[in-house]
Amino acid sequence: MTWDTKNQFETTKTSQELPATSQDHISDNKMNSEPSHRLSQFWSSLTRSSSESITAEPVVILGHTYREGDRDREGDSEVQKQVKKRYWMSYRSGFEPIKKHEDGPSPLSFVQSMIFNKNVGNTFANIHSLVDNDNFTTDVGWGCMIRTSQSVLANAIDRAGYEVDVELFADTSSAAFSLHNFVKVASDSPLRVRPGQWFGPSAASLSIKRLCEARNSSTNVPLSVLVCESGDIYDDQIQTFPVLLLLPLRLGIDHVNNVYHSSLLQLLEVPQSAGIAGGKPSSSLYFFGYQGTSLLYLDPHYPQNVSAGVGSYHSSSYQKLDISDMDPSMMAGIVLKNNEDYTDLKRRTTGNKIIHFHEARNYNDYVEVEREDFIDLGQNNRSATAGAEADFDSESSMVIVD
């Protein structure tokens, strides 16, 4: 079964919501006759459509530019068609149980999030999740960073020119890129993340890398993965193609610093973009484009049943967030199909303040991932979690509360 989320998430403006043009205000003495009134309405509709297509700011979606009023031959919105092509991973309920760890949060600590969510009907369809305190059968309340990371990965595979098999992202332990395996990889690592604990961007990046490496060892998954800490990209590490570059970033303290605004938009504008997993305070979102200073995103905080079909991985509905309201912690994805792509990326991002290109890495450098990169949201007192954020330094702090 497929859920239609258009009504919940649709925020794009219709022509009726756009500012009226001067032709909309026609004095009474020009409307005395019915024929002239109809002619005026016809002319108004023509000029309004023309005005909207000229004055509306262009919409940029993963390196391609569209006008908000653009329509295809069938009259469908070109922007919404492009949005629907993106892969959207969201909360799921009723999946294969993930056993609670004795040192981790309990499933019932997320009951409030399970009940008060954006798809209450899904909650009642999976009522057992409200009484099982031994197993996680939904990621509502804690899995949004994993879902947006899955979105980056799925869209990266698509951007690399390969068909995306959504079964690889199914919520079972046998699926290569499932939530179950994201949790397992992190749990088996020295970080020892537990089910129900939140992933930071650095941890999400490393988990994607390990899952892709494991999958490549047994089956032909097209992507290799490089994690580029601090936005540093080294020529001598770009060896195989296609390659997914993951950049765990922190671009400010409470909000994205103004100095990075244009550079951040550029990461969504280049044709190599795979999107950004990040968000606003208290949630992680999948950003795939922008219009003006408004970032366009797909929201993972919409629970769907695990049995929902292929259509549930797409939606033509999206929301907007002004860049000034964006949380500074995020993970950006860039896909390089070949060396020409890499050369083009370097040319397009000359002067970018986020990514930096180097000929070779100093191999005395190393990446240290802190245990605090995982935050336990199973605590009843969330203020303790919020207080912990202040103790993190700018390098290891990748904190968003789900």
Swiss-Prot record:
Function (record text): Cysteine protease that plays a key role in cytoplasm to vacuole transport (Cvt) and autophagy by mediating both proteolytic activation and delipidation of ATG8. Required for selective autophagic degradation of the nucleus (nucleophagy) as well as for mitophagy which contributes to regulate mitochondrial quantity and quality by eliminating the mitochondria to a basal level to fulfill cellular energy requirements and preventing excess ROS production. The protease activity is required for proteolytic activation of ATG8: cleaves the C-terminal amino acid of ATG8 to reveal a C-terminal glycine.
InterPro entries the UniProt entry points to: Papain-like_cys_pep_sf, Peptidase_C54, Peptidase_C54_cat
Listed name of the protein: Probable cysteine protease ATG4
Keywords carried by this UniProt record: Autophagy, Cytoplasm, Hydrolase, Nucleus, Protease, Protein transport, Thiol protease, Transport
UniProt-annotated catalytic positions: C144 (nucleophile), D299, H301
Family: Belongs to the peptidase C54 family.
Native species: Meyerozyma guilliermondii (strain ATCC 6260 / CBS 566 / DSM 6381 / JCM 1539 / NBRC 10279 / NRRL Y-324)
Predominant place of localization: cytoplasm
Pfam family, one: Peptidase_C54
Reaction(s) the record says it catalyses: [protein]-C-terminal L-amino acid-glycyl-phosphatidylethanolamide + H2O = [protein]-C-terminal L-amino acid-glycine + a 1,2-diacyl-sn-glycero-3-phosphoethanolamine
Protein transport keyword on record: yes
Gene Ontology MF terms: cysteine-type endopeptidase activity; protein-phosphatidylethanolamide deconjugating activity
EC number of the protein: 3.4.22.-
Chain segments carrying region Disordered: 1-38
GO biological process: aggrephagy; autophagosome assembly; mitophagy; piecemeal microautophagy of the nucleus; protein processing; protein transport
